[in-house]
Design a protein with these regions (language model features):
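HAD-like aspartate-dependent phosphatase fold
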Residues: 1-135
């Protein structure tokens, strides 16, 4: 799966995911960007679609909010061919003392709204194994 060089990724995730994308030379928006770290209501009238977003990548994001989900939803809905990717589909995330919602719980919101499953590119999905074999 190749993203065209003129396209970028909208990230729901944290700094580690941004580092991985940058190390592969992949442009991205969202993620830890300050404008997406807000508790203000999301408004479609303020949203400016970026037609260069060719994929939405949903990972674990401990700062998830309605703005991030709404932007991801709009890119996937408006940008023809925009890929819906998930780092993994884990429903929970083990922490000391118990469990927290995992990355799959975050992408589930978009799955439900879009009626579309993401391509899981992390463990233990076939996409990751294909990438390992190709290297």
């Amino acid at each position: 799966m190749k993203l065209p060089p003129n396209k970028k990724v909208y990230v729901i995730g944290m700094a580690g995911l941004e580092t991985e994308l940058a190390s592969e030379g992949i442009s991205y928006v969202g993620g830890t960007a300050p404008e997406d770290h807000t508790l203000e209501p999301f408004s479609l009238s303020d949203f400016r679609n970026d037609p260069d977003v060719g994929a939405v990548l949903c990972g674990l994001d401990m700062h998830i909010n309605y703005t991030k989900l709404s932007k991801a939803f709009q890119y996937l809905r408006l940008n023809e061919g925009c890929l819906f990717l998930a780092t993994n589909t884990d429903s929970t995330y083990p922490v000391n003392g118990g469990l927290l919602p995992g990355a799959g719980s975050l992408s589930a919101t978009l799955r439900y709204a879009l009626k579309k499953d993401p391509v899981s590119i992390g463990k233990p999905g076939p996409t990751m194994l294909d990438c390992i074999k190709a290297k």
